Amino acid sequence: MPSTTSQNIGTVISIRGSVVDIRFDNISSDNQLPPIRTLLRTGKDNSIAIEVFSQLDDQRVRGIALTPTQGLARGMQVEDTGEPLQTPVGKGILSRMFDVFGNTIDKKDAPIDVEWRSVHNEPPPLARRSTKTEVFETGIKVIDVLMPLERGGKAGLFGGAGVGKTVLLTEMIHNMVGQHAGVSIFCGIGERCREGEELYREMKEAGVLDSMVMMFGQMNEPPGARFRVGHAALTMAEYFRDDEHRDVLLLMDNIFRFIQAGMEVSGLMGQMPARLGYQPTMGTELSQLEERIANTGSGAITSIQAVYVPADDFTDPAAVHTFSHLSASIVLSRKRASEGLYPAIDPLQSSSKMATPSIIGKRHYDLAQEIRRTLAQYSELKDIIAMLGMEQLSPEDRKVVGRARRLERFLTQPFFTTEQFTGMSGKLVSLDDALDGCERILQDEFEDYPESALYMIGAIDEAHEKSKKAAEDKPKAEEDEDATSLHDA
């Protein structure tokens, strides 16, 4: 931790959960009342950290504890550090794992050759910003074809509990960190400790940890720590962008937990809640975080963020406010997850501002539009099929249904990060192979193939082998069935 120089000493006068009131009696021209966002230290060995949130009068401040307040009592002395919360930056932080205070949590010695910087920075001014129109390939078919990501943009993975947000984010890390030439930063906000440990182990085994930094503010930590960990990770990202002129891939899991932590802090501080109990300042707090994720002439920060959607309600204020900051929105569907169509991305609800002919090219754009049109027609026909059956459809509509069902299955993909659970080896598919497969399905080349031949494959040519194998296995299965029947007789 950076050394503290201030000798402004106060006294704890009130403790209510994570909210602590402190009085400073020796206020003078030399010792001023601690400004907003100043870090205070108290407790045994100064182990309890408090951030000033408001000044109540000319002698009292109110702060939120960033650490548990067990053992804190009225009358204890509080030291004003004279500095805001700071985090380490520098080449020494690569391959390491940190908490919100910049302490290492990977059981290794503290990094050397680092500089400490405030986690509270302003977004770059408009004059320094730059825009890019370059596509960032993920190796995941459905994303690259229908909702391409922007290099230097912000993409959100929206979904309720258990539809695969973290799995999809982990797969993106696996596919993109290896081919990403810059630095990758993973920021865990209010998520499970187990997931952080698993990710660290996987990245170490994959050999990509040397160009990666991890920062965690886990579920069990006080709301103040979860509220600031995103800002700390962004300070690290800004260092690599501005000082080392490198591109940064910033992965955040989960933005909803950041908003939730802000809601807890707001409630503790006694602010009047807005709709559904959210804090009245949610839009401002989210903008202060999101607007720092920006591109400048010296480098770009590409951000992928998981966003939990409470009760699958996409009109929830947390989801609505987050949508407005993103260049690509990837919506995960519980219905598709229940049908086993993984990744469970809803292609009709998901969108990307990159999906225009001038950026991705006319062929890609036309194919994406045709795929969406086919899937939308199938969605409309589902009610008729449920009531009257396929027989009542016109021949043309039956062809549309067949194409849509084959497209749905082709856009599934086995993941590297789930190999141990599914028993299927992961596939990384190039954009050209994905577009080629979709085009051939739309041209009815695979009309006579079983739908299962297109399910959980990589490139489209794998369907030939899968169909051939299924045809060989079928007579064998029938022979086994006949032998069993004969034995029973």
From Swiss-Prot:
PROSITE patterns hit by this protein: ATPASE_ALPHA_BETA
Region (Disordered): 465-489
Superkingdom assignment: Bacteria
Keyword terms of this UniProt record: ATP synthesis, ATP-binding, Cell inner membrane, Cell membrane, CF(1), Hydrogen ion transport, Ion transport, Membrane, Nucleotide-binding, Translocase, Transport
One of the record's GO cellular component terms: plasma membrane
Keyword Cell inner membrane assigned: yes
Membrane topology per record: Peripheral membrane protein
Cited Gene3D superfamilies: 2.40.10.170, Bovine Mitochondrial F1-atpase, Atp Synthase Beta Chain, Chain D, domain 3, P-loop containing nucleotide triphosphate hydrolases
UniProt-annotated location(s): Cell inner membrane
Top class in the EC scheme: translocase
One function term, GO molecular function aspect: proton-transporting ATPase activity, rotational mechanism
SUPFAM superfamilies membership: C-terminal domain of alpha and beta subunits of F1 ATP synthase, N-terminal domain of alpha and beta subunits of F1 ATP synthase, P-loop containing nucleoside triphosphate hydrolases
Reaction(s) catalysed (UniProt annotation): ATP + H2O + 4 H(+)(in) = ADP + phosphate + 5 H(+)(out)
EC number: 7.1.2.2
Biased segments, Basic and acidic residues type: 465-477
Binding site for ATP: 159-166
NCBIfam families associated with the record: alt_F1F0_F1_bet, atpD
Protein task: Produces ATP from ADP in the presence of a proton gradient across the membrane. The catalytic sites are hosted primarily by the beta subunits.
Family statement: Belongs to the ATPase alpha/beta chains family.
Entries under PANTHER family matching the protein: ATP SYNTHASE (PTHR15184), ATP SYNTHASE SUBUNIT BETA, MITOCHONDRIAL (PTHR15184:SF71)
HAMAP family in alphabetical order: ATP_synth_beta_bact
Protein name: ATP synthase subunit beta 1
Organism: Marinomonas sp. (strain MWYL1)
